[in-house]
UniProtKB/Swiss-Prot annotation:
Residues the record marks as active site: C200
Keyword Metal-binding attached: no
Protein name: tRNA uridine(34) hydroxylase
Organism: Escherichia coli (strain SE11)
Keyword tRNA processing: yes
Catalysed reactions listed for this entry: uridine(34) in tRNA + AH2 + O2 = 5-hydroxyuridine(34) in tRNA + A + H2O
Length: 350
């Protein structure tokens, strides 16, 4: 029986990927459709992807599939054909091709079965996820941006919105999608007469969010087909103005795709214009935050002087200090400071 999981260390896999001479293409896709046995589907897809040297992150659930992957350029069309043949529900599926791609987005294939392909926190048995809002194409998006009766709702996390968003788009301040859904309903209660346009990175979150808004009594709901990625691609192809400002945050090694030249965010340490996310180099922290080149040199890639000092300690002492610490997701929130940290480190902006 073939091995259906990775057995090589991350460091070795990354080194192998960086040594590759063939270019790679970063692709994302999703599909809401019923999967009777996600574990069986997972194993079959794992073999298909491995045979084509595909890396990336794939989630499967009874409700469908969500994938962000890296495919050798010479295998892209073969991958597309085999994916379309895998299940009738996947035939003709839109594949979002990365806009700003160095081919180094992933170096290992991780494929997991989950309860949901997007953690939404919805437990209402009457919710119909298929009753979604209407799709918008690039030209229609631009027209809506000029419509005074339209409100654009960003269904991404705060750190994604911080580095890039559509003109005048409303941020739903939250750290997770499950937190955003009830907040979006609450914040829009006074605007039920408005046209609500929802968007996200590649479409998966705003599609479900549009259905949730309709479930909660909002009738004028649209969402951008293919999200920011497809909008920017189509706008450029059609010679339309690209109305997304800044950088599109992505959840892979790149951490962002440049959409426009504007830098709308600031370094979390010194306040200089910057939109480059990084993880703190201290293995006991790994906080996600924005750091400019000057501060990266000053703090040696760390989020604070304390982390800088700790990362310089002998490995044994670092491990001793990390023992017993929680290791949750740590994200810098400009409005609330450090989240989920156990180091007791001051806010990096102070």
């Amino acid at each position: 029986m073939p091995v259906l999981h990775n057995r090589i260390s991350n460091d070795a896999l990354k080194a192998k990927m960086l040594a590759e001479s063939e270019p790679r293409t970063t692709i994302s896709f999703y599909k809401y459709f019923h999967i009777a046995d996600p574990k069986v589907t997972r194993d079959a897809l794992y073999q298909l992807f491995t045979a084509l040297n595909v890396f990336g992150r794939v989630y499967l659930a009874h409700e469908g599939i969500n994938a962000q992957i890296s495919v050798p350029a010479s295998n892209v069309e073969t991958f597309r054909a085999q994916l379309y043949d895998f299940d009738p529900a996947l035939e003709g599926l839109r594949l979002n091709i990365a806009l700003d791609d160095d081919g180094k987005s992933f170096w290992v294939l991780r494929m997991k079965v989950r309860d949901r392909i997007v953690a939404d926190g919805i437990d209402d048995p009457h919710f119909d996820a298929s009753n979604v809002g209407e799709y918008l194409q690039a030209a229609e998006v631009n027209a809506m941006l000029d419509d005074p009766d339209a409100l654009f709702i960003d269904m991404r996390n705060h750190y994604e919105y911080e580095v890039g968003h559509f003109e005048n788009a409303l941020e739903i301040p939250a750290d997770t999608f499950r937190e955003q859904l009830p907040k979006a309903v609450e914040m829009m209660q006074a605007h039920k007469d408005k046209k609500i346009v929802m968007y996200c990175t590649g479409g998966i979150r705003c599609e479900k969010a549009s259905a949730w808004m309709k479930h909660n009594g909002f009738n004028k709901v649209w969402h951008i087909e293919g999200g920011i990625i497809e909008y920017a691609r189509k706008a450029r192809e059609q010679g339309l103005p690209v109305r997304f400002i800044g950088k599109n945050f992505v959840f892979d090694e790149r951490m962002g795709e440049r959409i426009s030249d504007e830098i709308i965010a600031h370094c979390h340490q010194c306040g200089a214009p910057c939109d480059s996310h990084t993880n703190c180099k201290n293995d006991g922290c790994h906080l996600l935050f924005i750091q400019c080149p000057v501060c990266a040199e000053k703090y040696k890639g760390c989020c604070s002087e304390i982390c800088c000092e700790e990362s310089a300690l002998p490995p044994e002492e670092q491990r001793r200090r990390r023992a017993g610490r929680e290791n949750g997701n740590k994200i810098f929130n400009k409005s609330r400071g450090r989240l989920n940290t156990t180091l007791g480190i001051p806010d990096p902006t102070e």
